[in-house]
């Protein structure tokens, strides 16, 4: 396989490949990143860090989608939800996908060069996780854990960029985000479970089996417990606790949605997690003075 020149006429297909038209993944990455920036800076992140991390998340999520579709190009045609993706349909070649991935990670690396040396070093972990995750579903029943680490790696990076240290709050938030990510991505995997079983792809939805709802509930309990401890350690104001209360209600609502394990309801529950992330961010936002 050779690298290919990116063609302007294929821009709509590149947009679809990067999922720019489907921002849910970007939002689920952005909220924990913003939590970390606000916690690390007591609600006053620098404008530079805010812009760099926002753009970095958008670009790296796009890069992750590209390498994911490249890794899955031979199996996506067997899954109802993914059979129309650009690499499967032939609208984008494998060479174009790799060229686009290299372009995106290059731009992301240029952005991270604006941050501290230690943050730059941490960014290589983000790249490794983004590259490895798509292949994990072939080798482990827990690819969602790797996804959680990938989706949360901006948390230690945000703390390092802000205070040049990784306090206990950073790691508690990182672990909380892994619990949350595994929970919501298990709901997402429940949508494809029947197809994945046929083609031999592994996931937590398959691993958890009939206990999927119970384990999702336990993961979300761990997530909430960790977010409670973070709030207590940081002595955060009332609005944070209100945001946490809203998040709890939303997580309970998701349990109701997935009760019958219907595909559409599981996907709806997955999408609802955007509001969980937003609730925590609004809570943090109003717990501190207005930033910038």
From Swiss-Prot:
User: Which superkingdom does the taxonomy of this entry point to?
Assistant: Bacteria
Bilayer-crossing residues are 24-44, 47-67, 97-117, 119-139, 145-165, 171-191, 214-234, 238-258, 270-290
* Chief place where the protein resides: membrane
Establish whether keyword Transmembrane helix is in the entry.
yes
Pfam hit, one:
UbiA
Q: Name one GO molecular function term.
A: 4-hydroxybenzoate polyprenyltransferase activity
Q: Which InterPro entries has this protein been placed in?
A: HB_polyprenyltransferase-like, Prenyltransferase, UbiA_prenyltransferase, UbiA_prenylTrfase_CS, UbiA_sf
Q: Which UniProt keywords apply?
A: Cell inner membrane, Cell membrane, Magnesium, Membrane, Transferase, Transmembrane, Transmembrane helix, Ubiquinone biosynthesis
List the EC numbers from the record. Answer: 2.5.1.39
Q: Please state where this protein is localized.
A: Cell inner membrane
List the membrane topology term(s): Multi-pass membrane protein
Q: What class of enzyme is it?
A: transferase
Gene3D superfamilies recorded for this chain? UbiA prenyltransferase
GO CC terms on record? plasma membrane
Q: Does the keyword Transcription apply?
A: no
Q: Which GO terms describe its biological process?
A: ubiquinone biosynthetic process
Summarizing the function annotation, the protein's role is: Catalyzes the prenylation of para-hydroxybenzoate (PHB) with an all-trans polyprenyl group. Mediates the second step in the final reaction sequence of ubiquinone-8 (UQ-8) biosynthesis, which is the condensation of the polyisoprenoid side chain with PHB, generating the first membrane-bound Q intermediate 3-octaprenyl-4-hydroxybenzoate.
PANTHER family membership: 4-HYDROXYBENZOATE POLYPRENYLTRANSFERASE, MITOCHONDRIAL, PRENYLTRANSFERASES
Name the family the entry cites.
Answer: Belongs to the UbiA prenyltransferase family.
Can you name this protein? 4-hydroxybenzoate octaprenyltransferase
The organism is Pseudoalteromonas translucida (strain TAC 125)
